[in-house]
Structure formats: structure tokens, C-alpha cells
């Protein structure tokens, strides 16, 4: 959801569609002008694998991956409608000759990709062979982590066949590479910064940061660890669990502001930032019902 531009994005029938929030939230007696606020198809037909949105260098951008076979082509779009605050002052949404989005850029990764994390001036792509970091200016992928050096070979062997999930920023100088069964620490140059491997209890399908904590989503439980030292803090049991909202800006885990943590600043999200992590799971008693849970930090759990 791009509240700043009064837009809601979703994938429908493998196509990326943009809707006005006024249309999505309209009540039965609403007088929304549907002709002026019709949804816009942002991609081709049935060719979108996934999309993310976030801010890079003060621009709001939307990235989507085309459904290629053994390679990945990414399209980058920029919304150009006037902001919702301007729309409210005007009292209506001026369309004029502009469109919802303009084509901003594109790039190619010669392998299958499963996710993107955006940072201030660069992005990390999760691929079938690990992580690739690049900027839109140069578009020269750098494989992360750096695997040279005898001292890191144990870690390199451990992550060799692991499925790459996401790259999360812990501080200005350190990042966490999250895989399905473990995580490793790297510095801003992509070099392994600690000799430890954070082993998970389960097999994570998704990973997110919430304040000082790493939240991991297995299909049968949610695993919560201290992001700085890897200590297990909590297990939340369930069935058919999926992450709905990772708490990051634009629901994509991107560009998180620094949040004070018990043992340093962690670039995550928290209720203080207005966003929280949310998940959906099977209702424990009613097979035909699912429940949505919101993860909130218990004050007694905070680490001093």
C-alpha cells in the first residue's frame, strides 16, 4: 500500500494492478467516480513473479520480477500522481495527462530470484545461488558473502546449499543474511563479520526484523530471536503460518528507520514506528477459519 500516493498494489492473475485507496475503501453509498479512478495494470499479462516497494535516494519505487524461467528481469516503476495530502486539499484527484506510474529503470539477474531488499542507494536480490547486491546506477551484481579466506570456509560450506531469504540491515556497518535454516553476519562490504552461525530451530519461509528481534516464520511456528546475539527468545506455535506484514515500510521490509534496542540500535520496525509484524494461521478449533495475529513487544521481555 502506497498511502503517500493514495494507491494500493496487488497481484491478480499474475499481473500487477494499482488501485486508488478511495475505491478499495469505498462504502456502499460512496460516490467515487469509478471512471476517473479505474485500476491500472502495471505489467504484462500473467508475467509477474513478485513485487516490492520502497524508497531509494528519496524516490518511491516499485520493483517487480517478470516470470522468466532460469533468469530474472526486473522492471522498476515510479508513482507520479500527486500525494494524497495534496489530493485532499484539492478535494479531488486530478488525472490530467499523467499516469499512475512511469517506467523508471530495469535490470537483469542471470538466475532465478525470489526476493529483494532495498537500502538507501543499493538493493539485495535473493537468488537460487545466494545474494546479489547492486545499485541501479551501475547494475553490476556483487555476490554476498565474500567467500575468500580460510577463516570463513566453515561458514561458506554451511550456507552453500541453503535457500536465501533476505538481507536485513542491523546497523550502518552490519547486515544479517537470512537463509532457510540459519543466518550469518556480514559487514557493509559483504565480508563475513563474525565467526558464528545463527542456527534456527525450524525452516524459515520468511524472515523480518521487529525492533531488536529477528522474527522467523516456519509453517508450524514463529521463532523469535535476538538479532544481535542470536539467542532464542520465544516460540509461537500454530499451523499453516504465513507472514502477512513484515512491519517494514510499504510492507516490503525496506528502509527501516533506526529503532533503539537494548543492546544497540537495530534497523528494524516497531510499534513506535507505526508498523508491526502480522501473521495469519489456521484457527486452532475451527478448520474453516483463519486468525490474524499481531506481534507486539512485551515490556517485560525487553533486554536492558
Specify the residue positions occupied by each region the protein language model found.
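Eukaryotic assembly scaffold/adaptor repeat-domain signature, activating on surface loops/turns
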Residues: 1-194, 201-231, 240-304
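Extended acidic/polar alpha-helical scaffold segments
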Residues: 234-235
Amino acid at each position: 500500500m502506497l498511502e503517500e500516493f493514495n494507491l494500493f498494489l496487488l497481484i491478480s492473475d499474475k499481473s500487477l494492478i494499482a488501485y486508488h485507496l478511495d475505491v478499495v475503501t469505498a462504502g456502499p453509498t460512496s460516490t467515487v467516480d469509478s471512471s476517473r479512478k479505474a485500476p491500472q495494470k502495471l505489467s504484462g499479462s500473467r508475467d509477474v513473479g513478485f513485487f516490492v516497494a520502497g524508497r531509494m535516494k528519496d524516490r518511491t519505487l516499485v520493483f517487480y520480477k517478470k516470470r522468466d524461467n532460469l533468469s530474472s528481469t526486473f522492471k522498476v516503476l515510479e508513482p507520479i500522481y500527486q500525494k494524497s495530502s495534496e489530493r485532499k486539499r484539492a478535494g479531488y484527484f486530478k488525472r490530467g495527462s499523467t499516469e499512475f506510474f512511469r517506467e523508471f529503470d530495469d535490470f537483469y539477474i542471470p538466475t532465478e530470484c525470489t526476493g529483494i531488499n532495498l537500502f538507501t542507494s543499493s538493493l539485495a536480490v535473493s537468488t537460487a545461488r545466494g545474494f546479489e547486491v547492486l545499485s541501479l546506477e551501475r547494475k553490476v551484481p556483487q555476490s554476498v558473502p565474500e567467500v575468500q579466506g580460510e577463516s570463513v570456509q566453515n561458514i561458506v560450506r554451511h550456507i552453500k546449499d541453503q535457500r536465501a531469504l533476505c538481507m536485513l540491515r542491523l546497523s550502518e556497518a552490519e547486515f544479517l543474511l537470512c537463509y532457510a535454516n540459519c543466518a550469518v553476519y556480514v559487514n557493509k562490504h559483504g565480508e563475513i563479520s563474525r565467526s558464528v552461525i545463527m542456527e534456527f530451530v525450524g525452516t524459515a519461509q520468511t524472515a523480518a526484523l521487529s525492533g531488536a528481534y529477528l522474527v522467523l516464520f516456519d509453517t508450524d511456528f514463529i521463532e523469535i530471536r535476538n538479532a544481535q546475539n542470536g539467542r532464542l527468545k520465544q516460540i509461537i506455535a500454530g499451523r499453516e503460518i504465513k507472514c502477512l506484514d513484515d512491519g517494514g515500510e510499504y510492507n516490503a521490509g525496506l528502509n527501516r528507520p533506526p529503532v533503539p534496542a537494548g543492546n544497540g540500535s537495530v534497523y528494524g520496525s516497531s510499534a513506535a514506528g507505526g508498523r508491526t509484524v502480522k501473521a495469519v494461521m489456521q484457527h486452532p478449533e475451527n478448520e474453516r477459519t483463519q486468525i490474524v495475529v499481531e506481534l507486539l513487544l512485551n515490556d517485560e521481555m525487553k533486554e536492558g
